[in-house]
Amino acid sequence: VERTREPGESAFQRDQPFGRNQGNVSAERVVVSFKIELPKGLAPMSQLLLALSIVSFTDPPTAPAPRPVKQFRIVETRTGMELSLPRLADDLASRDIIYFGELHDNVAGHRVYADLAALLADRRPDLVISMEMFERDVQGVVTDYLRGRIDEATFLKYSRPWKNYARDYRPLIELARDRKLDVIAGNLPRPVAGKVASKEGSTSPFLPRKSTAPLDRYWDLFTESMKGHIGADEGMARMYRAQCAKDDAMAEGIADYLAVHPHRKPLVVHCTGDFHCDYGLGTAARLAQRVPLAQAAIISMVALPDISKADLTEDCKKAHYLLVVPTPPKPAKPPGKSG
């Protein structure tokens, strides 16, 4: 029996699909010989079948499939225990409100959240999804699409989705459409937020009925996060007023939904940037003021170059659970560009 393998290649590597050991190397021919003793008196055809069966048992064993690279970790911050996604869904199913705190540009994290939402819908058919990514004035458009009254093209035209909608948020909307779940368009419309920031008067019905901007820990974290983005203190204060108005709008939207469905007691998942819920601040704090008896859980997304070697001590202070995902690769520079 003659077989060809590359220099330094093991027998099982040789049998793998094309592409394992490519390169500019010369192949060596390896001759494997063996002798089979067959019982005498067998017919020629019987001898052939027996020989083939022996050869099949003398082939080299195949190597076990390589373990898949772990794409995310889920950590319960109270105990430090790592959880599987189904186990996390089991733990969360008894809550009233869950915050999916996200890094908006992390594709891996969005995929995990979409899978988790589906698992929660399996356990809680009364699931409701609230989203920062849609503004309050397009609630009717969102609901019309979920109920099949308009097609997707019309929905996309009038709902003003974020630019990464197709990749990152469409799975959630389609899950809601397939399972007949409600979606809350939670965010404050941008023009209204702009008027809040500039202290212009507004009678917009989409403003939260109550909104405050206290100079508390949330303000401290906000100013720290915005360093290098805004120069003047007054500019920082304007942005903070708009930030707080958005938090109050999203909290109010969820509280109002719960108020008009008092007998359902649904599980609400709120999808939002992690800053709106980390440390129980932002939207999380304002919803707790409006619905103080609700049992909430916060998940915060953490992106690291190597998720297997991470000191999460400080991150564990942010939330009840951490979703640890790889840092997205930096986009390649266009040819000929430098700096």
Region locations from a protein language model:
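Sec-dependent signal peptide recognition
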Residues: 43-51
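N- or domain-start disorder-to-order transition segments that initiate the globular core
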Residues: 57-95
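Zymogen propeptides
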Residues: 80-81, 85-121
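Membrane-embedded segments
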Residues: 106-112, 128, 136-141
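A substrate-binding/cap region within the structured catalytic cores of diverse enzymes
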Residues: 123-128, 139-262
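Short internal beta-strands
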Residues: 128-134, 298-301
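C-terminal regions of proteins
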Residues: 249, 258, 262, 266, ...
